[in-house]
Amino acid sequence: YQIMGLVDAIVRDPAFTADTAVRTRVRSPVEKLVGIQQAAGNGAPSPGAGRRGPAVVANVLRAADYLPFLPPNVGGFPQGSLLLGPHDLVSTFDLLATLDAPPPAMKSVDALLNRFSLFDVSSTTRHVLSAEHDAGRRFALAAMSPEFAVT
């Protein structure tokens, strides 16, 4: 199928990048997991590779009650603001524990934000990240930023 015309029309539409379309959807735990793995420079994990296997990832997602293809009830997975709250921070800590190794230190806050695909963060988020000098904690703070919680 030829879909480039459709894709082009979608991304050129002003509604695609309008303020009402940006950061209006809360990331699911699976989306956060993928984002954290990508930001750390990891590709898709190979089964049994590294010290953290699929069981660790499954346990983290089970604790968040968000195992793919196994919704908690017939209504499906929680969505929207139901994914936000103190449990979201705990879940993000658990997702960070799935990394096989500490993420590489970034040369700047902008480089770290680019790894997370965050390009328009608040001055508060930027200040918090700039004030932290430990690379691991800085990575964790970026993963827990309000901007990363939504997409």
What spans do the regions from the language model cover?
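Flexible, low-complexity segments enriched for small/polar residues
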Residues: 2-151
